[in-house]
Structure formats: structure tokens, C-alpha cells
């Protein structure tokens, strides 16, 4: 009887892992090219401030990088926006990827939720945008918290 319980637990665990992996970005558009290549552009600590001319310059640089690199994925790693209004800042900071219809993912830094929106509200905003791959996985702490699969 102990062996049956052990096998049952193993099977339930295996199927749970498979199911949870399938739930997270199961319709991901991330694929290696036929040549086996996948290009990622990373922007970090953009500190976008809505209405600040320096932020407009940062937007120009992001456009230049995206035009030059033509990435398969863009990742923003923390402190994308610095200062309220957060929604306006996020929409302007993400404009380069949104207008190109590129898939993107965001992780939050220590300043992102200091702009008048909580991390949960920011994630809800991101989830409403086309191309966003940011999400949170049930049962894991942190917002957002996820893994992306490249096939």
C-alpha cells in the first residue's frame, strides 16, 4: 500500500508541475529562429518621469536601440517609471515596444510602486497591453513573478 501511495504522490506532483508550466505563458510567441538565434534587448533603470525632457531623450535612445537590434523580446528590469502619474509614465516608456508590436516583459524595481500605483495595479496595467508577457504565478510570492519559455 505504501508503494501505491508513493507512486500516486509522484504522479500528482508530476502532473501539477506540467499543468502549472503550461498555464504560464502557454501561448508564448517566443521562438528561436531557424538558425537557432533569439535576440533580447534589455532596458534597466529607465526612471521615466512623465513630462521630463530627459525622459523623452531616453525614449529616443530606446527607439534607436530597437531599430538597430530588431529584437525578439524586450525586457525592462526594474525602475521603469519614477514619479507620478505612473500610468502616463508607463504608457510613454513602453511606447517604443507597443508601436513595434514587440513582445515584452517587465520586472519591478524599488521605485516602480512609488509612483501612485501599487505593484498589483501596475501588473494589471501591463496585462492590459498587447505584447505583454508579464504575469504572476499563483502560489509564488512577489509581483510580478513568472518565467518565460523560448521554444
Named regions from a protein language model:
Residues 24, 91-151:
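Extended active-site neighborhood of metal-dependent phosphoesterases/phosphodiesterases
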Residues 16, 65, 74, 106-107:
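Short, intrinsically disordered/low-complexity patches at protein termini
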Residues 21-96:
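N-terminal active-site segment of His-dependent metallophosphoesterases
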Residues 8-16:
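Bacterial N-terminal signal peptides
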Residues 15-16, 57, 91, 124:
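Hydrophobic alpha-helical membrane context
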Residues 1-5:
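Positively charged n-region of N-terminal signal peptides that target proteins for export
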Amino acid at each position: 500500500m505504501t508503494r501505491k501511495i508513493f507512486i500516486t504522490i509522484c504522479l500528482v506532483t508530476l502532473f501539477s508541475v506540467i499543468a502549472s508550466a503550461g498555464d504560464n505563458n502557454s501561448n508564448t510567441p517566443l521562438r528561436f529562429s531557424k538558425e537557432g538565434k533569439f535576440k533580447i534587448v534589455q532596458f534597466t533603470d529607465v526612471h521615466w518621469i512623465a513630462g521630463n525632457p530627459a525622459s523623452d531623450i531616453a525614449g529616443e535612445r530606446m527607439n534607436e536601440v530597437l531599430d538597430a537590434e530588431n529584437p525578439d523580446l524586450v525586457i525592462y528590469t526594474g525602475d521603469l517609471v519614477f514619479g507620478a502619474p505612473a500610468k502616463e509614465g508607463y504608457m510613454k516608456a513602453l511606447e517604443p515596444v507597443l508601436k513595434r508590436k514587440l513582445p515584452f516583459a517587465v520586472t519591478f524595481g524599488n521605485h516602480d510602486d512609488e509612483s501612485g500605483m501599487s505593484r498589483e495595479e501596475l501588473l494589471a496595467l501591463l496585462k492590459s497591453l498587447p505584447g505583454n508577457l508579464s504575469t504572476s504565478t499563483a502560489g509564488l510570492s512577489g509581483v510580478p513573478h513568472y518565467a518565460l519559455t523560448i521554444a
